[in-house]
Amino acid sequence: MMKSALAFAAILAATLVLPGHAQDAMKKDTAVKPAPSPSQAVLESWNDAGRKLTAMAEDFPEDKYDFKPTPAQRGFAEQLLHATNANYYFTSLALGQKPPAEEDPKRDQFKTKADVVAFVKKSFADGAAAIKAKGDKGMSELVVDPGSHQQMRLSDLAYGLIEHDGEHYGQLAVYYRVAGLVPPESRPKK
């Protein structure tokens, strides 16, 4: 009984002491990074959404670009065209231009995988350039969302479209799985 109590005490002591030493080591090795500026935070999120959708656009087999999990859904390429075309609601307003038409680009306008990939990349590059050009002050400007006709900050519109891109990323991850493939973000890191 005494040996069990001593063993328990030793384990308890180690459990309480070791995490403290690990935390002290972490505190010494890592300095706190400053928070990004508001426009930098938007840019980082925008670029992350773009990286994920671009990786999917580049990775998905071209012979499956019109794949639909069910007949009622958009094809893989149509999902990408819809999501990335919507980015221009932000970009056009940020640059003082007219927003794109309500309808999605037609698949026959983007006949090849390379055409779709180029559109995805350009959409995110144009948005990133607009965010950089606007900076913190410009991203705080008030605009009217063409869809809801509600006034909002330009940064809020950008975040709304980042969220929209995330929704379509999630849908496309399902397309991958139904097609028997593994999405790039779900693969083991090399």
Residue ranges and their predicted role:
Residues E44-D48, K52, A118-D126:
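A non-catalytic, amphipathic alpha-helix used as a structural packing/dimerization or gating element
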